Amino acid sequence: MSTDCAGNSTCPVNSTEEDPPVGMEGHANLKLLFTVLSAVMVGLVMFSFGCSVESQKLWLHLRRPWGIAVGLLSQFGLMPLTAYLLAIGFGLKPFQAIAVLMMGSCPGGTISNVLTFWVDGDMDLSISMTTCSTVAALGMMPLCLYIYTRSWTLTQNLVIPYQSIGITLVSLVVPVASGVYVNYRWPKQATVILKVGAILGGMLLLVVAVTGMVLAKGWNTDVTLLVISCIFPLVGHVTGFLLAFLTHQSWQRCRTISIETGAQNIQLCIAMLQLSFSAEYLVQLLNFALAYGLFQVLHGLLIVAAYQAYKRRQKSKCRRQHPDCPDVCYEKQPRETSAFLDKGDEAAVTLGPVQPEQHHRAAELTSHIPSCE
């Protein structure tokens, strides 16, 4: 794929065509094994996480989709804009810049659901966002690419992998719907399945990280793309959290939207790269996609570790304040809700204070209040 930037002031200053590095050989069997194994594990993980979803809560998110709307705005508003600014700021070559834009325009991936579970996020919102962003990608991916690539004259059309999007959507909806049904019919068994799914999710993260490092070994890596693949997910997490906070979402939803924003669907991006670029450019761009996937897993694990450390610190603080209270006396974390929801929506919803900043503070503190009198 070649790109003509002559006479275009918005194109990066060092946008010159040169041969990319060659050589991604000897990994065909490993990639096939990784594809099959990850597909099976993703299906099982999504089924188990579906066991944590209650149909009433899911319907509440769909009926009043404030959290979903904020998440989609982060996914298809902030991420493509961030990708464009990174491409311009680092002066990427045209084919590299377009690959970064492709990554920024992709919907959320399954990894986000695993990380959301480990940070006590809103699983109903997480699964709703992943599904809705995948559906929205049918129109938003070409729209975002059209808006941000207008400054370059492309001699080859970009191809949107609609078939891959459809397969992704089916692989999300079918296991999750099955899990929701199991949770409705057999709630006790669903709890056990959910615990198993959390373990499988951890194994999935480990497989992705190890495979990414193995596939990247020996590649002729572009340092600039590696730097972008490292900071891009972090920028997504931070901007997603800030947008959720500014729209008065609860802390639980802020964590969820932050994770969903930074964690992209790597498989979908790889499919789009393979359909849009010739082999001479594909090696370097696949390297970027795999590096992004590796870094988003590492960043996610750091976020989980930081949250769990904070959670243990709060629990120890409560133990010191209430030494006679046993460990099991902590109340189950209440369902945090958006400040936009009305009181009449559902009686079981935990309502926050009137002021938005108080809403955030109270929603977080109530998850650590012991139930002992």
UniProtKB/Swiss-Prot annotation:
It catalyses: estrone 3-sulfate(out) + 2 Na(+)(out) = estrone 3-sulfate(in) + 2 Na(+)(in); 17beta-estradiol 3-sulfate(out) + 2 Na(+)(out) = 17beta-estradiol 3-sulfate(in) + 2 Na(+)(in); dehydroepiandrosterone 3-sulfate(out) + 2 Na(+)(out) = dehydroepiandrosterone 3-sulfate(in) + 2 Na(+)(in); androst-5-ene-diol 3-sulfate(out) + 2 Na(+)(out) = androst-5-ene-diol 3-sulfate(in) + 2 Na(+)(in). One of its GO terms (molecular function) is symporter activity. Belongs to the bile acid:sodium symporter (BASS) (TC 2.A.28) family. Disruption phenotype: Knockout mice have normal reproductive phenotype, however, males show higher cholesterol sulfate serum levels than wild-type. This is Sodium-dependent organic anion transporter. InterPro entries: BilAc:Na_symport/Acr3 (IPR002657), Bilac:Na_transpt (IPR004710), Na+/solute_symporter_sf (IPR038770). The lineage of its organism: Eukaryota, Metazoa, Chordata, Craniata, Vertebrata. The keyword Protein biosynthesis does not apply. Residues 1-21 are annotated as: Disordered. The keyword Lyase does not apply. Residues 54-67, 119-126, 179-195, 246-265, 306-373 are cytoplasmic. GO terms for biological process: lipid transport; sodium ion transport; sodium-dependent organic anion transport. Residues 1-32, 89-97, 148-157, 217-224, 284 are extracellular. Its main location: membrane. It is found in: Membrane.
